[in-house]
A protein has these predicted regions:
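Hydrophobic transmembrane alpha-helical segments in integral membrane proteins
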Residues: 10-37
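Hydrophobic alpha-helical transmembrane segments of multi-pass membrane proteins
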Residues: 36, 58-76, 199-210
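Alpha-helical transmembrane segments in multipass membrane proteins, preferentially the mid-helix core
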Residues: 39-43, 104-105, 133, 160-183, ...
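Internal transmembrane alpha-helix with an interfacial aromatic "cap," most often the third helix
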Residues: 41-48, 77, 93-125, 131-139
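Membrane-interfacial loop-to-transmembrane alpha-helix junctions, especially the N-terminal start
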Residues: 51-63, 115-123, 189-192, 260
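Helix-loop junctions on the outward
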Residues: 69-92, 135-142
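Extracellular-loop-to-transmembrane junctions of the mid-late helices
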Residues: 142-170
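C-terminal transmembrane-bundle signature of multipass membrane proteins
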Residues: 167-170, 191-261
């Protein structure tokens, strides 16, 4: 059995992990991000029982997105509190899993209107390009920052983002939504497109705060702002995406029940 000294030591270690400095808003966003993602996961998963069968998979994907993010935020929180550094590798592992799943939501919403699997693969390929280029731009940035390196890989990453943005607003996703017989789906896809336009645009702000980034050199915004913008963007986009899908599923289910009543 553990003695009182060992138990006190373990208790102190556990408390040290959970201590959030009062003057550190970034640590606060890591903790709240973890709790918000976990709560959203539980909500989306259990709400599957309230929607028609054809919407259950969409809500499951929403729950997976926030659950994967919650797990990574748990470890990113501890990493940040222990080191004070950006958890770049953990963050990009999270994004590599969750961003393609967000593309899956577009496919599932437009599948009934004739979306083919090729659309899904194109969206996933664009998201992978966006993330791989962004990771190279951050993880392999020379010490002290290199503006040319940051800008080059930022532009490459933006190509993937622009493709997804165009597809959601004017391309295949937008056309399939317009051709669907559901006003709910049309409005839902347009709302998700707004998330891609406005919500995803927060990430480049964080990217440009790292050493060598435009905001770092122009305004003196340091690397500590990278995680602040990323954490805010994750909460808005991942939970927001899920809430839009949830709204579509609930509304469509209620309308279907009203028709059959």
């Amino acid at each position: 059995m553990l003695g009182s000294k060992q138990l006190n030591f373990l208790n102190m270690e556990l408390l040290n992990v959970l201590v959030i400095p009062k003057d550190d808003p970034i640590a606060f966003t890591f903790f709240t991000g973890y709790m918000a993602m976990l709560a959203a996961s539980i909500f989306f998963f259990f709400e599957r029982s309230r929607v028609d069968d054809k919407w259950k998979l969409s809500l499951l994907v929403s729950a997976l997105i926030t659950f994967i993010a919650a797990v990574h935020y748990y470890y990113m929180r501890d990493y940040y509190l222990a080191t004070g550094e950006n958890p770049t590798a953990l963050r990009y592992i999270d994004w590599t899993l969750t961003v393609p799943l967000m593309c899956v939501e577009f496919y599932l919403l437009t599948k009934a209107a004739g979306a083919k699997i090729s659309l899904l693969w194109k969206l996933i390929a664009a998201s992978v390009l966006m993330l791989v280029a962004g990771y190279i731009g951050e993880a392999f940035n020379p010490e002290g920052g290199d503006t040319a390196h940051s800008v080059f890989w930022g532009v490459i990453s933006t190509i993937g983002y622009i493709y997804i943005l165009y597809t959601a607003w004017f391309g295949e996703v937008a056309k399939l939504a317009a051709a669907s017989n559901s006003e709910i789906v049309k409005k839902g896809v347009r709302t998700l497109a707004w998330f891609v336009l406005a919500g995803w645009a927060i990430y480049p702000i964080g990217y440009m705060c790292m050493p060598g980034g435009w905001l770092n050199t122009a305004f003196g915004w340091g690397s500590e702002n990278v995680d602040l913008f990323y954490n805010i963007a994750d909460a808005i986009n991942k939970i927001g995406f899920g809430l839009v899908v949830y709204g579509i599923a609930i509304t469509a289910t209620e309308q279907n029940k009203a028709k059959t009543a």
